[in-house]
């Protein structure tokens, strides 16, 4: 199952981009025997619309249009569920075992996700009640995807 990290906005060169790339690159060899990967990154430009609702709608439509056909969706959203790394891995495996060709992890723009994206998500995940910069959320999500792959593989990376 192909994995896709789809985000609004571009990560500039720097430490955050390097970390995301490091985890995405690690997913391919670790996930191949499990039928997971490769992991591709899709970056959608931020909308220039004046109203937040219009920005979210434009960004949401662009995100959904960029995803592979038949992809399952896991969206990061403050209204989502807080999952342990093990639960996250189990949810990923369930999507894979359901025969999906791809699983997309969605990070919205500064205004959040459009209802159209939330409605299509099989799962919404929150990283707590605090607000984090989008750059760090991408790093955290890429690491959690890699961690989930290693949990499913029985690799010692995850020791909890």
Curated annotation (Swiss-Prot):
What keyword terms does UniProt attach to this protein? Cytoplasm, Methyltransferase, rRNA processing, S-adenosyl-L-methionine, Transferase
Q: Does the keyword Cytoplasm apply?
A: yes
Under which main EC class is this enzyme filed? Answer: transferase
Any one GO cellular component localisation term in the record: cytoplasm
Q: What's the Enzyme Commission number for this chain?
A: 2.1.1.177
One annotated GO molecular function is: rRNA (pseudouridine-N3-)-methyltransferase activity
Pfam families reported for this sequence: SPOUT_MTase
Any transmembrane segments, and where? Answer: none
Tell me what reaction this enzyme catalyses.
Answer: pseudouridine(1915) in 23S rRNA + S-adenosyl-L-methionine = N(3)-methylpseudouridine(1915) in 23S rRNA + S-adenosyl-L-homocysteine + H(+)
**List of residues binding S-adenosyl-L-methionine:** 76, 108
Q: Where does the record place it? A: Cytoplasm
Annotated HAMAP family = 23SrRNA_methyltr_H
Q: Which family does it belong to?
A: Belongs to the RNA methyltransferase RlmH family.
Q: What role does it play? A: Specifically methylates the pseudouridine at position 1915 (m3Psi1915) in 23S rRNA.
Q: Subunit structure of this entry?
A: Homodimer.
Under what name is this protein listed? Ribosomal RNA large subunit methyltransferase H
Gene it is expressed from: rlmH
